[in-house]
Amino acid sequence: MSLEFSLAKDLILIKKYIDESLSPSQITTTHMYENKLPSDIKNSVIQVKNSNNIYSHLLKLTSLKNKIKPVTEMNEVYCSKHRGVGCKAGSDAVFETKHIDGPFGMIPKMTLFRCIVTICNETETETIVKENTYNMKEGEFVAIDYNRDLHYIKVKDDFTPGEKAKRYVLKLHYISYPSWCPEIIAKMYGLLNINYNIIARKAFLYTLKPTTFPQKTLNWAINTTTKIWAVFFYKSGPDVSGA
C-alpha cells in the first residue's frame, strides 16, 4: 500500500531531519518518539499519520463499520540496523526473529495496528508478516496487528547492504474498534498497550548493548520469551480480532 503523493514532501522533511539532526547510531537501532520531535517535524508526522489511505486500509482489514483511533504515544521515528540474531546483537535481535509485538491478542474485537511507513530503504530490508513479504520503498506502508501478527525483518536474499546504507521508517499506531463499543473501552485498551510498550522499551534500551551480567541475563530472557510466546500464540491463539 502507498501513501498519497501529496505526503512525499513530508517524508523528505523527516528524512532530512534524521540525517542532519537525529544523527542515528551506525551500530544499533535508533528510536525517537513522536512527542519528542521538533514541532515542524512533528507536524509532518501528523500529516502522514492522518493519511486517508492508511485509515481506509485499516478499515478494510477489520470492518468498514469500525472506528479508528490513533495512539500517538506509541508513534516513533525508527532507524534500523541489521545486527543478526546472536547474543552480541542485544535486544536488536528481536526484530530479526519471528515475533509478536504485544501480549493482548486474546482481547476480542479490539485491534491495535502498527503501520510501518517507509521513509527510505537502502538496505533492501524485507518485512515478513504472516509469511507475506514486503520490500517497501519510500511512501509505502504495511499494517501489522501489534498483538497477533507473527512478523520479522531481514535483508533481501543475495543482497549485501553497504556500510552506510540507511533504513528509516515511521511506526504509527491505531486502534480499530467496533462502532458500538464505548470510547472509554478503546481508551483503556490503548492504555494497556501504551504502558506495555513503555516497559518493553525500557528493557529494550537497557539490553541494546549488553555487557554486564544483569544486561546479558535480561537480554537472554527477552529473546527467549519472544521465541516462546511467538510459537505458543501462533499455534494456539484464536482469531479474535473480528469486528
What does each model-identified segment do?
Residues 1-78:
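Non-heme Fe(II)/2-oxoglutarate
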Residues 2-5, 97, 114-118, 133, ...:
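Conserved hydrophobic/aromatic beta-strand scaffold that supports enzyme active sites
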Residues 70-72, 108, 120, 163:
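A generic structural signal for short, non-catalytic loop/turn and secondary-structure boundary residues
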Residues 76-81, 87, 187:
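C-terminal membrane-anchoring module of eukaryotic surface/secreted proteins
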Residues 83-108:
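Conserved short histidine dyad/triad with adjacent acidic residue
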Residues 102-123:
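Short, conserved beta-strand element in jelly-roll/cupin
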Residues 122-242:
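Catalytic core of Fe(II)/2-oxoglutarate
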